[in-house]
From Swiss-Prot:
Keywords: Lipid metabolism, NAD, NADP, Oxidoreductase. The degradation of estradiol by gut microbes containing 3beta-HSD leads to a decrease in serum estradiol levels, causing depression-like behavior in female mice. The prevalence of K.aerogenes and 3beta-HSD is higher in gut microbiota of premenopausal women with depression than in those without depression, suggesting that the estradiol-degrading bacteria and 3beta-HSD enzymes are potential intervention targets for depression treatment in premenopausal women. Catalyzes the degradation of estradiol into estrone. Can also degrade testosterone. This is 3-beta-hydroxysteroid dehydrogenase. It comes from Klebsiella aerogenes (Enterobacter aerogenes). InterPro entries: Epimerase_deHydtase, Lipid_A_modif_metabolic_enz, NAD(P)-bd_dom_sf. Belongs to the 3-beta-HSD family. PANTHER family: BIFUNCTIONAL POLYMYXIN RESISTANCE PROTEIN ARNA, NUCLEOSIDE-DIPHOSPHATE-SUGAR EPIMERASE. One of its GO terms (molecular function) is oxidoreductase activity. One of its GO terms (biological process) is lipid metabolic process. It catalyses: 17beta-estradiol + NAD(+) = estrone + NADH + H(+); 17beta-estradiol + NADP(+) = estrone + NADPH + H(+); testosterone + NAD(+) = androst-4-ene-3,17-dione + NADH + H(+); testosterone + NADP(+) = androst-4-ene-3,17-dione + NADPH + H(+). Its EC number is 1.1.1.51.
Length: 337
């Protein structure tokens, strides 16, 4: 087995490389951060620096040579960006990579999507894979849904490659650059965390290692009989109030900080104002309408399909995941400017 991991220099992809190397699996990794690429090489991975939005066929040929399984973790995940940027990174890059994978004989293509395509500014619990909102919440969600359509079309036309879609909810852990780092920044700079409804939203999260474990299961021969392009929700399977998760992080980090309850409408007005000025400056604001709303609404997934069909069970609990993440942040100096 030889696995190509895209988006390997941060987040899920970075954790995926470590997971595979710990199993002794041959790994080829690609990403844009060449400094991190050197660290991946020291772990025993073969690193090829590349920007998938600019990849040409000659580069793809080298990247995919000898690969039988591809874990496509690369994605533009910001809540702030243009339609063109999301389409280029999440739709076009996925289509071209999928086409090249088929051409060069990749047997398994695991595509990392997002439950954001379910989000519609309403409370939802135990969301199943076939749920769709009346309209997508933002360009990111729309682009991830479009990337899944690309995967579906590729699967229909190419039966010799099995495509898998995984939708992990609220990923966190070592090498995270999104949710936890932003929370920590707020804790450090303001000494408080502002949460709508006091953090009473019931949410699901996914520790990176659990998501990678699901990717591993989906790549095994026992899953070959499953329909190509089938989608599975992935989470820790431990819905908690957002407040309890944030408080656990505060306690583990030992930061002097308190959680402040702010009315959702007030926080949303602030976020919309920041978005207005952000549009003028082209800079991502500290708060966005989408980001604030994700903190306000109940949002949990039904993972029974993954449990029954992939044999998925989380291997790291939510509490242990937060403890490990806090330890990693402290060990790597992420609590200082």
């Amino acid at each position: 087995m030889k696995v190509l991991v895209t988006g390997a220099t941060s987040g899920l992809g970075r954790n995926a490389v470590e997971y595979l190397r710990n199993k002794g699996i041959s790994v080829r990794a690609t990403g844009r951060n060449e400094a991190m690429g050197k660290l991946l090489s020291k772990m025993g991975a073969e690193f090829i620096p590349a920007d998938l939005t600019e990849l040409v066929s000659s580069q793809a040929k080298v990247m995919l040579a000898g690969i039988d399984t591809l874990w496509h973790c690369s994605s533009f995940t910001s809540p702030w960006g243009t339609q063109q940027a999301f389409d280029l990174a999440n739709v076009r890059a996925t289509r071209r990579l999928g086409e090249w994978s088929v051409a060069w004989g990749v047997r398994n293509f695991v595509h990392i999507s997002s439950p954001s395509l379910y989000f519609d500014y309403h409370h939802h619990r135990d969301i199943q894979e076939d749920f769709r909102p009346h309209r997508f919440a933002n360009e990111f969600a729309r682009s991830k849904a479009a990337s899944e359509e690309v995967i579906n079309l590729l699967a229909q036309a190419n039966p010799h490659t099995r495509f898998t879609i995984l939708r992990p909810q609220s990923l966190f852990g070592p090498h995270d650059k999104v949710f936890i780092p932003r929370m920590v920044q707020m804790m450090r700079h303001y000494g408080s965390v502002l949460l709508p409804r006091g953090g009473n939203a019931l949410v699901d999260m996914t520790y990176y290692e659990n998501a990678v474990h699901a990717m591993w299961l989906a790549s095994q021969p026992q899953c070959d009989h499953l329909p190509s392009a089938r989608a599975w929700n992935i989470s820790n399977g431990e819905p908690r109030t957002l407040r309890s998760i944030v408080q656990k992080l505060i306690d583990e980090l030992g930061i002097k900080c308190r959680i402040r309850s702010v009315p959702y409408p007030m926080l949303d007005i602030i976020a919309r104002s920041m978005e207005h000025f952000g549009n003028k400056s082209a800079k991502e604001p500290a708060f966005t309408h989408y980001g604030v709303s994700k903190l306000n609404f109940d949002f949990t997934l039904d993972i029974s399909r993954a449990q029954q069909e992939l044999g998925y069970q989380p291997i790291v609990t939510l509490d242990e995941g937060v403890t490990r993440t806090a330890a990693w942040l402290k060990d790597h100096g992420k609590l200082h400017d």
